[in-house]
C-alpha cells in the first residue's frame, strides 16, 4: 500500500489512492508509464509537504508566495452570504475566467439544492448546482484561484479529493477557506473575525468540539495531502436575520488581503455596509428589549477588546480583565 519514491522513502497511500494506483497500473496513456506518472504525483505532494514544514519557520511575509486557492461554500457555513459574496465580489471586480468544474450529480440532493429555471433571449434553461473554479488576475504581478459551490449533501471525502486534485493541477500551494457564522456580537462594532493558520496550532483552534461544515473538512484533507492551509471566519449578529451582510464580506476581504499582501477594492460594498448598519440601528431603536440586549453585547465586546489590548502589552491586570469578561459572560448565560 505504498510507493517507494527516490530518496524520499515510503509514502503511505490512503485507501482511495491505492485504488487509483491499481487502476493506473492496469492502463497507460500518452506513452508514459502510469506507475511513473503516479509516482510523480506523490513526489510532488511529498515535496510540497516538505516545503510546507520548512515554511513554518519562515517569516509571515513568506505566506503570500505561490498560488493560492480561495474556497467558499453556500449554506450552513455562509451566514448572510458573507463568505460566498466575497468570492463573487472578486470574480466581478477583477479580470476572471472559469477554468474548472466539478460534476454535480454525485454530490447534491436536488430536493435541498434545487436547480434554477431561467429564461434568456426567449429560451428556457436549467441551472444545476455545481462547483466552479476561477482564475482571477488581481494585477500584473498577482493572481489567485477561487472555488465556489453550494455545500455538497453527499460524499464529502470524494468531493474534497476532487477539489484538491484540481488544486494540484493548478500548482496551488495554499488553500484558504472562507466562512461566516451567526454569533452574539453587536452590529455597532467591527464584526469579529477569526483567522486560523494551519501552520500554527493555536489554542483557539483546539477549543472547539462539535459539528463542522465542508470548509473544515477541506482544511483537514488539504493538510493530509501536504497543502498549506488557512481559514477565515467572520461573525454576523444573529439578531438581524439572514439578509446579505456586506459588512461581513468586507471584513473577510480585508483579512484576506492582509494575509496575501494585496488591498482589495471594496468601494461598492462600503455603501451597502453602511445601509445595513443604519437599518440595524433603526430596528434596535424600535425594540426596547433588543436595545438592552445590544447594549450587553457592546459591553462584552469592549471588555474583551480591552483585555486583549492589555494582554498584548503584558500588563499585570490583563488576567483580572479576562476574569471579569468571563464572569460577565456567565452572568449573561444565567
Q: Each PLM stretch: what is its role?
A:
Residues 1-11:
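Extreme N-terminal basic, low-complexity initiation segments
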Residues 51-151:
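N-terminal short beta-loop-beta anion/metal-coordinating cradle
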Residues 150-198, 218:
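Internal, conserved structured core segments that host functional sites
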Amino acid at each position: 500500500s505504498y510507493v517507494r519514491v527516490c530518496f524520499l522513502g515510503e509514502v503511505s497511500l490512503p485507501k482511495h489512492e491505492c485504488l487509483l494506483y491499481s487502476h493506473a497500473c492496469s492502463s497507460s496513456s500518452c506513452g508514459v508509464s502510469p506507475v511513473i506518472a503516479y509516482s510523480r504525483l506523490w513526489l510532488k505532494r511529498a515535496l510540497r509537504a516538505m516545503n510546507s514544514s520548512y515554511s513554518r519557520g519562515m517569516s509571515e511575509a513568506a505566506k503570500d508566495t505561490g498560488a493560492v486557492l480561495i474556497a467558499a461554500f453556500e449554506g450552513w457555513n455562509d451566514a448572510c452570504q458573507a463568505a460566498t459574496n466575497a468570492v463573487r465580489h472578486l470574480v466581478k471586480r477583477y479580470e476572471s475566467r472559469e477554468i474548472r468544474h466539478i460534476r454535480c450529480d454525485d454530490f447534491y440532493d436536488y430536493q435541498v439544492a434545487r436547480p434554477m429555471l431561467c429564461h434568456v433571449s426567449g429560451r428556457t434553461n436549467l441551472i444545476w448546482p455545481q462547483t466552479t473554479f476561477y482564475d482571477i488576475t488581481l494585477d500584473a504581478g498577482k493572481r489567485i484561484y477561487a472555488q465556489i459551490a453550494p455545500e455538497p449533501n453527499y460524499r464529502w471525502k470524494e468531493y474534497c479529493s476532487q477539489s484538491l486534485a484540481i488544486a494540484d493541477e493548478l500548482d496551488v500551494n495554499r488553500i484558504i477557506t472562507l466562512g461566516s457564522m451567526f454569533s452574539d456580537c453587536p452590529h455597532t462594532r467591527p464584526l469579529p473575525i477569526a483567522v486560523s493558520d494551519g501552520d500554527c496550532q493555536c489554542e483557539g483552534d483546539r477549543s472547539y468540539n462539535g459539528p463542522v461544515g465542508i470548509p473544515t473538512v477541506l482544511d483537514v484533507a488539504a493538510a493530509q495531502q501536504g497543502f498549506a492551509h488557512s481559514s477565515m471566519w467572520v461573525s454576523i449578529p444573529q439578531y438581524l436575520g439572514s439578509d446579505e451582510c456586506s459588512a461581513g464580506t468586507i471584513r473577510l476581504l480585508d483579512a484576506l488581503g492582509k494575509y496575501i499582501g494585496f488591498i482589495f477594492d471594496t468601494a461598492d460594498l462600503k455603501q451597502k455596509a453602511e445601509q445595513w448598519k443604519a437599518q440595524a440601528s433603526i430596528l434596535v431603536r424600535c425594540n426596547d428589549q433588543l436595545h438592552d440586549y445590544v447594549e450587553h453585547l457592546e459591553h462584552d465586546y469592549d471588555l474583551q477588546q480591552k483585555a486583549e489590548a492589555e494582554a498584548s502589552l503584558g500588563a499585570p491586570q490583563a488576567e483580572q480583565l479576562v476574569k471579569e469578561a468571563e464572569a460577565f459572560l456567565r452572568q449573561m448565560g444565567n
